[in-house]
């Protein structure tokens, strides 16, 4: 017998002299009748590993739920864990306005035609919806001129100050006057974003900005609206503020309570030109409100376009 023949016979045997097992096929891996295995495991082995993983994942889930429960207990549902300076919330309130149509959320254009009620009715409806929350006066209280919401921070039994919309009605910026949109003297509601614990800080004597010197009242947030460009400033016309001193500071600080009523001010554009687009820049003023044009900090922009022309009839189908 040649060396090649002897080597071939030796390769078929293990070192202990037993014959090598034939390579297992994929079908045999799936189910091996001789060994009684499925996917390489016997029934007993499958039972053992199944029980192990069931117990393992039960303990793992219990550990996760326990950690999550401990974490949630450290959170206050009314106050963010981190807020104020150095946090993403910050200390400088943003400025918002209404009406802002949800159907076109990316647009800051307020455009309507005096001769087409369908064009200005959506703005009236939006303001109706926005101001409807003030009709619920449950768990609120009347606050006098010297009262405020200071007690809300320490006394959970105190109700927040009730915000009265009557001032807007008297100035023809209420629902009965369609907020001025029907007459072409639109009113825009201006408010500050809610920041936990924030309240306006008064200007020092002599440091009140020129833009608001005649209207500034300590304790309030004065609103001032101007045209964004020289063209806009020229055509903006007469602007009326309701109240004249801006947002009343006695409704601060903001505290998370369900019945809290956010203070607002109305800006009425009495002589806005017809058929001209005017870009408006409104700023909120208090000593602790910063302004930054690049990030629009402490200010808000929107466009006004009041048309006065016969609406174009829709083509017949």
UniProtKB/Swiss-Prot annotation:
Identify its membrane topology class. Answer: Single-pass type II membrane protein
Q: Name one GO cellular component term.
A: sodium:potassium-exchanging ATPase complex
Matching Pfam families, A to Z?
Na_K-ATPase
Keyword Amino-acid biosynthesis attached: no
Those parts of the protein on the Lumenal side are 72-317
Q: Does the UniProt entry include the keyword Cytoplasm?
A: no
Show the GO MF annotations: ATPase activator activity
Q: Which InterPro entries match?
A: Na/K_ATPase_sub_beta (IPR000402), Na/K_ATPase_sub_beta_sf (IPR038702)
Query: Where does it live in the cell?
Result: Cell membrane
Q: What GO biological process terms does the UniProt entry carry, in alphabetical order?
A: intracellular potassium ion homeostasis; intracellular sodium ion homeostasis; potassium ion import across plasma membrane; sodium ion export across plasma membrane
Chain segments annotated as transmembrane: 51-71
Q: Name the family.
A: Belongs to the X(+)/potassium ATPases subunit beta family.
Q: What is this protein called?
A: Probable sodium/potassium-transporting ATPase subunit beta-3
């Amino acid at each position: 017998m040649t060396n090649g023949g002897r080597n071939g016979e030796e390769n078929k045997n293990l070192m202990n002299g037993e014959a090598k097992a034939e390579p297992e096929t994929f079908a045999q891996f799936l189910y091996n009748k001789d060994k009684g295995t499925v996917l390489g495991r016997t029934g007993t082995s499958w039972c053992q590993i199944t029980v192990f993983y069931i117990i393992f994942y039960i303990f793992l889930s219990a550990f996760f739920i326990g950690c999550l429960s401990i974490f949630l207990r450290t959170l206050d549902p009314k106050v963010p864990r981190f807020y104020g300076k150095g946090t993403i919330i910050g200390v400088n309130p943003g400025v918002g306005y209404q009406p802002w149509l949800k159907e076109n959320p990316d647009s800051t254009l307020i455009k309507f035609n005096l001769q087409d009620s369908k064009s200005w009715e959506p703005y009236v409806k939006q303001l109706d919806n926005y101001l409807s929350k003030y009709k619920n006066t449950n768990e609120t209280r009347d606050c006098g001129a010297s009262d405020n919401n200071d007690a809300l921070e320490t006394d959970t039994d105190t109700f927040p100050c009730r915000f009265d919309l009557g001032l807007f009605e008297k100035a023809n910026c209420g629902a009965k006057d369609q907020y001025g949109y029907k007459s072409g003297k639109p009113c825009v509601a201006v408010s500050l974003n809610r920041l936990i614990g924030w309240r306006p800080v008064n200007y020092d004597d002599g440091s009140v900005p020129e833009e608001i010197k005649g209207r500034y009242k300590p304790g309030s947030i004065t609103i001032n609206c101007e045209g964004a460009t020289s063209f806009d400033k020229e055509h903006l016309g007469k602007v009326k503020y309701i109240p004249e001193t801006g947002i009343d500071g006695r409704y601060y600080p903001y505290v998370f309570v369900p019945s809290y009523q956010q203070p607002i001010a109305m800006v009425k554009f009495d002589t806005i030109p017809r058929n001209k687009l005017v870009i408006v820049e409104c700023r909120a003023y208090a000593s602790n409100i910063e302004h930054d044009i690049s990030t629009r900090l402490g200010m808000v922009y929107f466009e006004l376009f009041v048309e006065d022309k016969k609406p174009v009839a829709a083509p017949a189908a």
